[in-house]
Amino acid sequence: MAKDYPRSRRIAEQLRRELAEVIRDDVDDPRVGSVTISEVQVSRDLAHATVYVTVLGAEAAEAQAGIDILNKAHGFLRSQVARRIRAKRTPSLRFLHDTAFDRGARLSALIDEVAPPPADDEPSKE
């Protein structure tokens, strides 16, 4: 497992904040949809950043289309972020779909199937 360095954590958090603002304010493509950046992982040499995103309220194909658009716009996004952060170098960006939310929703649905929540109209035990 790779070591986690405080500088790379700081840069990752700063990238996450700035990318969220840039995508919200400067990306006008409606195919991107409502994007949430859940995590940014930066390489030790700070040359590459993997950005995990979720597209809210979108089917898998629509979400992937939005992520593909972000990957095509990575140069624009990188230049906009470079203007906002103080770093010698801005990492190259790669956007990936974060499946953690989808897995959590699927597990929650499976749990509800096995043990459905109690009905409200059952008499309480007193």
UniProtKB/Swiss-Prot annotation:
Family statement drawn from the similarity comment of this UniProt entry: Belongs to the RbfA family.
Record-level GO cellular component terms: cytosol
UniProt keyword annotation of Cytoplasm present: yes
Pfam short name (any one): RBFA
Quaternary structure (record): Monomer. Binds 30S ribosomal subunits, but not 50S ribosomal subunits or 70S ribosomes.
UniProt cross-references to InterPro entries, sorted A to Z: KH_dom-like_a/b, RbfA, RbfA_dom_sf
Location(s) in or outside the cell: Cytoplasm
Role summary: One of several proteins that assist in the late maturation steps of the functional core of the 30S ribosomal subunit. Associates with free 30S ribosomal subunits (but not with 30S subunits that are part of 70S ribosomes or polysomes). Required for efficient processing of 16S rRNA. May interact with the 5'-terminal helix region of 16S rRNA.
Keyword Cytoplasm included in the entry's annotation: yes
GO molecular function annotation: ribosomal small subunit binding
Name by which UniProt lists this protein: Ribosome-binding factor A
Keywords: Cytoplasm, Ribosome biogenesis
Top-level taxon in the UniProt lineage: Bacteria
